[in-house]
Amino acid sequence: ILAGKSASTAHPMWTDDKLKDGQTVSFELGGCRKRYNVGLARTVHLGNKKPAKLIETAKVVEEGMTAVKATLFANAKAGDVHKAWQNVLDKFGLEKKSRIGYSIGVGYPPDWGEHTISFRPKEQTVVPENAVVHIILGMWMDGWGMELSETLHVRKHDCMALSKFSWDIPLLS
């Protein structure tokens, strides 16, 4: 759970801080069935009105996820998929220095990653058909953050999300 002062970083430490009105909260969730793993991240806002910066950033991230999905298919290079994301960020003057995803699927403790594909600039790894990847478009800004992630099954000409959860950022009051 990314909230409060921990909302601007990935994988924060646990705290006893209480959630407060006006906070944007991201949840990173994982599921596992017979050692097949999936990840999912979504964001909510506590209160009656989303901040303009959250609305604007969410639109960019959604456009970026759409661009990533359009370029992720069998035999695509991981760096080209990352470039589709970066092109969207460049249009809006935003920056994300960390990778945007990795292979996932069959995993064994202590970690669910397969350590074979990493979506980062200039990565030359070819994404094979039937790979399963976790694309994480987290934007950790100064004092706040938001996340959208999907676990995607790579097919011959496209990819398919393994979840059907909305990308919308709901208000919780």
Region locations from a protein language model:
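Active-site neighborhoods and metal-handling regions in enzymes and metal-associated proteins
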Residues: I1-S173
